[in-house]
Regions:
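Short, well-ordered junction/capping motifs at the entry into regular secondary structure
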Residues: 1-2
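Conserved, mostly hydrophobic/aromatic
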Residues: 96, 116, 133, 173, ...
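Short, acidic/polar
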Residues: 253-260
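Contiguous mid-protein beta-loop-alpha structural module that forms a pocket-lining wall or clamp
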Residues: 250, 264-267
Length: 348
């Protein structure tokens, strides 16, 4: 990432951070010795200070192995002058075999509601109109804060509190885990005008065999029940998803089951990924089950073509309708050309 060390500076510094840096700091330095700052997942709020130090002292690598202070790990990220991402939770208690997050970020830690509310109020004061709540599994937010009341859907309560903040006009959240998606959350999305009618629900695969190998904690039937529930509660909802193509052991029948879910659910958008073994994950050890690259590429293209057809069909429902657009960018070449998103997250 290119980052200015200060607002007044015209000099950009190079910074690498996140899960990969947390796990493989030596490898990052070996491959990119010219990077000014390498940080992990536990001290992202220190990046500006470290960049300033690097300007005086040269390249810095600072990896903190563990922290119990979530406030040192997060900072609001502005997508534009009117939109910001707000982290409500770090870490993950799940054990998906393709994911490195639990081993490098640790267990789930929820921010205190008061800290979240105060940050969003500050953002609203600065002119931010839209906030996106971030967490590895937002639906489990607050479980660690409510030890004696684990059944309470605290994420839903948080949505109601944020909805009452003056100045904030649109609220989004990502990512929920299908197995933890509660009906109370859907009711909140339906009841609260500021909460966008957009739901991201990661599928990863439509095959029960592959879902089990991934340790996802749900099967195809349960996932589709969640999709049906979402559509029943939220009129004109826009649903997006994640799919991994070519997970170890995936055969043609497994892939076809994924396509069956795609055809049934009719997602507005899919974030598609070709499986690649990530060192340190369980799935990276499934070497004898790896799918050939040519097969992955062919399946990926079939999925892409089909989803393009579905997306075009879904987008046509907006023709001749009035939509509220939050303008995020003005063209540098023509001030009359604006870019923004409607409530469902579609770019116009």
């Amino acid at each position: 990432t290119l980052v200015k060390s200060s607002a007044a500076s015209d000099v950009y510094k190079r910074q690498v951070g996140g899960c990969a840096a947390q796990k493989d700091k030596e490898l990052v330095r070996e491959r990119a010795p010219w990077v000014d700052v390498v940080i992990g997942t536990h001290n992202t709020t220190d990046v500006i200070n470290l960049l300033n130090q690097a300007e005086d002292w040269g390249p810095i690598t600072e990896i903190i192995e563990e922290t119990t202070d979530i406030e040192t790990e997060i900072a609001a990220v502005r997508e534009s002058s009117v939109s910001a991402f707000v982290t409500i939770q770090i870490g993950c208690n799940n054990s998906c075999t393709f994911c490195i997050v639990p081993s490098v970020r640790g267990i789930e830690i929820s921010r205190r509601p008061s800290d979240i509310i105060n940050e969003i109020k500050s953002l609203a004061h600065d002119g931010v109109k839209e906030i996106t709540l971030l967490g590895q599994n937002v639906n489990s937010y607050g479980r660690d804060l409510m030890i004696n009341n684990r059944r309470k859907p605290y994420f839903t309560e948080l949505l109601y509190k944020i909805h009452d903040i003056d100045g904030i006009e649109r609220i989004r959240f990502t990512s929920p885990h299908p197995k933890d998606f509660k009906i109370e959350t859907l009711k909140a999305v339906a009841d609260l005008p500021k909460v966008a009618n957009q739901i991201h629900i990661p599928l990863q695969s439509g095959s029960n065999k592959i879902l089990s190998s991934m340790h996802r904690g749900y099967n195809q039937k349960r996932f589709l029940e969640k999709v049906d529930l979402i559509k029943s509660f939220i009129p004109n909802v826009s649903i997006s998803s994640d799919i991994i193509v070519g997970f170890p052991g995936e055969n043609e029948d497994d892939f076809q089951q994924t396509m069956d879910v795609v055809n049934y659910a009719e997602f507005d958008l899919i974030y598609m990924f070709k499986f690649s073994p990530r060192p340190g994950t369980v799935a990276s050890d499934y070497v004898d089950q790896f799918v050939e690259k040519e097969v992955i590429d062919e399946r990926f293209m079939r999925l892409k073509v089909r989803q393009t057809e579905i997306s075009e069909k879904r987008y046509k429902r907006f023709v001749n309708t009035d939509q509220t657009i939050l303008v995020e960018k003005v063209s540098k070449k023509d001030n009359n050309i604006l870019t923004g998103r409607i409530e469902g997250g579609h770019i116009v």
